[in-house]
Amino acid sequence: MSESVGCCDSVSQCFFDYYTSKILIIRSKKVGTLNRFTQALVIAYVIGYVCVYNKGYQDTDTVLSSVTTKVKGIALTNTSELGERIWDVADYIIPPQEDGSFFVLTNMIITTNQTQSKCAENPTPASTCTSHRDCKRGFNDARGDGVRTGRCVSYSASVKTCEVLSWCPLEKIVDPPNPPLLADAENFTVLIKNNIRYPKFNFNKRNILPNINSSYLTHCVFSRKTDPDCPIFRLGDIVGEAEEDFQIMAVHGGVMGVQIRWDCDLDMPQSWCVPRYTFRRLDNKDPDNNVAPGYNFRFAKYYKNSDGTETRTLIKGYGIRFDVMVFGQAGKFNIIPTLLNMGAGLALLGLVNVICDWIVLTFMKRKQHYKEQKYTYVDDFGLLHNEDK
């Protein structure tokens, strides 16, 4: 019963006690120096990091962006399959337009004059045979070259494989040409047009800056030293800035990233808001894991012979895909974040006294004396009762 009463008294004291501040001036160089040093750190943090570096007085918005590209350049090839041939933008840009990216054909394996007919399958552990019984009629291997006819035929003088119904002659399993067929692609150029918007601030801009005119665009090529504002880029320079070799990358293909960053302080003149370009390779280039390297796909060009037979030229194309990625953030003065950060700074300054009190009452030699001076307990009615006497 007594424990219950004691517990109730403790709860009552906690609920009805009133705490008020008491100013205690401690004349100590150590404590004073610690107090001012801690205050200086808080002020430096609020002014230096929050206000100056992080621009805590600004409201921010993220960028909205659209990107279009236009590639130009001519390449000449001379192969046994196609002979001497000129390649222009309609030949090597596949597809003509993509969302925020473009693909440039740099190398290929060409198989000409394919028709729907029967031929021996390419030799693999699953396709080699010794008799017709090894070749199931109608079998369709997803990784094979066609539908089997049920016959085992000669692929070469020493190898037999199952006959398939497919586009014949089949594509040969060979490595891509080295050096690449379209080695001249290194000198192709691309015009990147980027329009950005910060809707919160109703701010619009594009990477073709106001100081750029049509005559300048006809001859400029991006260079960090001489033409940092030019939106026309040489493909070899893009790959080179990523510390890659274009001719090596063009053999098997790959993926490059063109990064455009718009970080704009809208409290400053609009002419200061300009794009910053960086380039990097995005696909994995690991010498210890070079299985299925690069970037490639197949496409075909169809036509009919004079006798009406449908024929196609199959191209296994290797190339470089360029992904254009836009990042950015804009800031502009706003009273609300300014007041919020000022309030947070004042709250941090209030913590300085708490820290100094804790150090004084915990680590100082005269901590007990300071504690007696710091806290005074006054009972209600007790003082009035003593005064009446």
Curated annotation (Swiss-Prot):
Family: Belongs to the P2X receptor family.
Membrane association type: Multi-pass membrane protein
Gene Ontology biological process terms in this record: calcium ion transport; monoatomic cation transport; response to ATP
Name listed for the protein in its UniProt record: P2X purinoceptor 4a
GO MF annotation, one: CTP binding
UniProt keyword list: ATP-binding, Cell membrane, Disulfide bond, Glycoprotein, Ion channel, Ion transport, Ligand-gated ion channel, Lysosome, Membrane, Nucleotide-binding, Receptor, Transmembrane, Transmembrane helix, Transport
Disulfide bonds: C119-C168, C129-C152, C135-C162, C220-C230, C264-C273
Residues reported in the UniProt entry to bind CTP: K70, K72, R143, T189, N296, R298, K316
Cytoplasmic side: 1-36, 365-389
Top-level lineage group: Eukaryota
Keyword Electron transport among UniProt keywords: no
The species this protein was found in: Danio rerio
Chain positions recorded as ATP binding sites: K70, K72, T189, L191, N296, R298, K316
Subunit text: Functional P2XRs are organized as homomeric and heteromeric trimers. Forms homotrimer.
Gene Ontology CC, one term: transmembrane transporter complex
Location of the protein in the cell: Cell membrane; Lysosome membrane
Transmembrane segments: 37-57, 344-364
Catalysed conversion reaction: K(+)(in) = K(+)(out); Na(+)(in) = Na(+)(out); Ca(2+)(in) = Ca(2+)(out)
